[in-house]
Amino acid sequence: MAILVLGGAGYIGSHMVDRLVEKGQEKVVVVDSLVTGHRAAVHPDAIFYQGDLSDQDFMRKVFKENPDVDAVIHFAAYSLVGESMEKPLKYFDNNTAGMVKLLEVMNECGVKYIVFSSTAATYGIPEEIPILETTPQNPINPYGESKLMMETIMKWSDQAYGIKYVPLRYFNVAGANLMVRLVRTRSETHLLPIILQVAQGVREKIMIFGDDYNTPDGTNVRDYVHPFDLADAHLLAVEYLRKGNESTAFNLGSSTGFSNLQILEAARKVTGKEIPAEKADRRPGDPDILIASSEKARTVLGWKPQFDNIEKIIASAWAWHSSHPKGYDDRG
């Protein structure tokens, strides 16, 4: 057997590929367009193809040359909430339409398992905290809507073609496996990496977007999870499907929420740096609070996160940033 990782040259995807190669139990095939990913981030023992999953002839070639692929892990999607508000059609074209084209080729080639990188953004402003897998999904931005549409498309493809799927709904992803070759870099938009860039002196200050949320300190609250733990969850989800289980979704998070100001203070403690901060207006499409209940993943999949507190997650990312002050970029 073999696993195809879509988007395997990106931040989370490269952790996934490293984990698969580390286990050494099956062949690992990677597809990435390198629009946001880095070729050098792909483990040398993985088979790499550069291309777009929406190119069906290209994907047919990948499956034809790797007939032992029976499962796909899908990370290849645009994922910036703010950008999705400005360019919604870009997200529906790449994310949602891309899923249709992928599933058509998977069905044609007889590949029947897919583990999908979904998002907490499908819940929008959640009706309950912590968020359960059964919490109503009402996205408030095109990014979340595009991912929810992808989940719906997979549901009907399962019924029609028997392609079994597991959407893994991530909450905030942060940190770095010290053995991996990539953390978030290049035009960074995520809170923790920017905070650490300020600690390094790469940036002058961190902007805290919004101080009027319905939270104790006025900044929005998020649940954080380490990419190493996400990689383990993906492996468990593939095993779950291969055992003949039915399609189902899982939330992946630490089940503990931290506000932006709490993350800032924790980073100051871990790094020993002042980290200047300035408050700014809210970004459109950001909910007040997103905290997961990952009890289902822990019970059904046997998922056991190793990075179970925010300071540990920050410390792992800071170790990488400290040793790579200019970040990581193979584009010259």
Swiss-Prot record:
The active site is at residue 143. Its cofactor is NAD(+). Gene3D superfamilies: NAD(P)-binding Rossmann-like Domain, UDP-galactose 4-epimerase, domain 1. One of its GO terms (biological process) is galactose catabolic process via UDP-galactose, Leloir pathway. Its EC number is 5.1.3.2. It catalyses: UDP-alpha-D-glucose = UDP-alpha-D-galactose. It holds the Pfam family Epimerase. Keywords: Carbohydrate metabolism, Galactose metabolism, Isomerase, NAD. Substrate binds at residues 119, 143, 172, 190-191, 207-209, 222, 283-286. Pathway: Carbohydrate metabolism; galactose metabolism. Homodimer. This is UDP-glucose 4-epimerase.
